[in-house]
Swiss-Prot record:
Transmembrane segments: 17-37, 51-71, 98-118, 138-158, 165-185, 198-218, 243-263, 275-295, 320-340, 360-380, 398-418, 424-444
Official protein name in the record: Probable multidrug resistance protein NorM
Compartments in which it is found: Cell inner membrane
Protein source organism: Synechocystis sp. (strain ATCC 27184 / PCC 6803 / Kazusa)
Name of encoding gene: norM
GO function term, MF aspect, one: antiporter activity
GO biological process: monoatomic ion transport
UniProt keyword annotations, A-Z: Antiport, Cell inner membrane, Cell membrane, Ion transport, Membrane, Transmembrane, Transmembrane helix, Transport
Record carries keyword Cell inner membrane: yes
NCBIfam families assigned: matE
Pfam families given in the database record: MatE
Source organism, top-level taxon: Bacteria
Amino acid sequence: MTDISMRFGMQAEAREFLKLAVPLAGAQMAQAATGFVDTVMMGWLGQDVLAAGGLATMIFMAFMMTGVGLISGVSPLVAEAYGAGQTRRIGQLTRQGLWIVLLLSIPGMLFITHLNGVMHWSGQADTTIILSDSYLNVMAWGLFPAIAFATLRGCIIALSQARPIMLIVIAATLFNILGNYGLGFGKWGFPALGITGLAIASISAHWIMFLSLLVYMLWHKPLHQYSLFDSLHHLKPRILQQLLWVGGPIGIAAVLEYGLYLTASFFMGALGTPILAAHQVVSQTVLVLFMVPLAMSYAATVRVGQWFGQQHWPQIRQAALVSIGLAVLFMLTAGIALLAYPQQIIGLYLDLNDPANGEALNVGISIMKIAAFGLVLDGLQRTANGVLQGLQDTRIPMVLGTIAYWGIGLTASYLLGFYTPLSGAGVWIGTYIGLAAASIAYLWRFQKVMVRKKSLPVARS
């Protein structure tokens, strides 16, 4: 184990941070590329498929990220144990995290496959409901491997080993892209399964990622000291409670955050299929860009958590400043690109020469410009929350997120979308108002937590 208790300057902290963040960003971007290709191929299958597939993808992502949030306690707790030299505890945390995954996946699969009533109630078109249902019935089988992979990923990055994640995700992404093309359009001897074929390729990629990382962790000798999978069948209620004590609020916050995006998608669907299609195009583009600050938030959780294990407060503040600053810088650059090339980006998804796509194109351009300004807020709130997770401060941020996302963001989205001429653009503006509130709240909370924890002889949440 490297001596992480040494003093780091800002430049040195940035180097250590980027050693984690760059491979993780590569992995997240590769994974987002899968969603990007899915969306492009859905567009090739028609505007109805694009709208339905986009809505179904948002639903699956909401469930998946809720599960990922609930097991997110693995990463900060393992990072703290790694920083404190508690080798045995690392394996215990990882094993119990996998038990949580199993207990979450079964009810999650049942919910995903029984959402017809919700879609009818929200005013979705019949075609959208039928196509979404066929996609979700397959994607439900990818829920367990997706969350289990996130659990193992949380362990491995907390041990400062991010490169295997990137290689595994890139390989699975290439498989998914080829599978999409073969199964979606009937190439290379496969039947043309349309949107169902895209779902089959996606769940196959989730299983490949999970099993590949599992094999790596079993095979890699430096990891054997942690006994990661010994006595896997033993439930440890005390450790389960610790994981859920930290991860539970993160999971609830994920429900609220992704629930905001999902509800916004329902709002857009109620405004019309072309508007929903435009929303899906911009959402997918933003999601690809969001993968970088998301990776940075994971790295921030690990760096802050490792310093937290050593009780080094100046280094914790440095890690926070580095992660938030780099995330804001990246999203600012990405926002400029969206402002400069909105039509070209939308043209990757939709045929700009098809008159049937005219309304979707016009709405998409207006939304893209709004997203360009909102990206910085998205990156800021995500990395600031990652810093708080590294300090194992998750319950108050959950409350702050509830107020910001639903009390402010959702209300603003509804009012601006349905009671002003802004329509779909208003829904996006309202969402970013919520993210702005979350950003301010999380930064305030970080300052407050730092003052409080530094005054304690042994800081613990």
